Amino acid sequence: MEKYLLLLLLGIFLRVGFLQALTCVSCGRLNSSGICETAETSCEATNNRKCALRLLYKDGKFQYGFQGCLGTCFNYTKTNNNMVKEHKCCDHQNLCNKP
């Protein structure tokens, strides 16, 4: 009986571990030096949300960016003349949206 109870408890603890929210870095504006200008905090990506990192480059140089939790997030890179917008989404580990 104790063996079954131990297995049940182990299963519950493992399941709870998988249900924990994903912690992401949150910054409304990263400057060209990669420093957060709007007080870096964290956010919890729950309900299929992901950590997001958006970066803007001009003439190959990083200009500014955004970090946070988003419900709709797609990985893509868009190039327009000398500007490159890069959007990265992740959910594989906590704080995965650090540049």
Swiss-Prot record:
Glycans are attached at N31, N75. The keyword Glycoprotein applies. Disulfide bonds join C24-C51, C27-C36, C43-C69, C73-C89, C90-C96. It comes from Mus musculus (Mouse). Its main location: secreted. One of its GO terms (cellular component) is extracellular space. Monomer. Keywords: Disulfide bond, Glycoprotein, Secreted, Signal. Glycosylated. It is found in: Secreted. This is Prostate and testis expressed protein 14. Belongs to the PATE family. Induction: By testosterone. Residues 22-99 form the UPAR/Ly6 domain. The gene is Pate14. Predominantly expressed in the seminal vesicles. Expressed in prostate, and to a lesser extent in the cauda epididymis. Residues 1-21 form the signal peptide. Pfam families: UPAR_LY6.
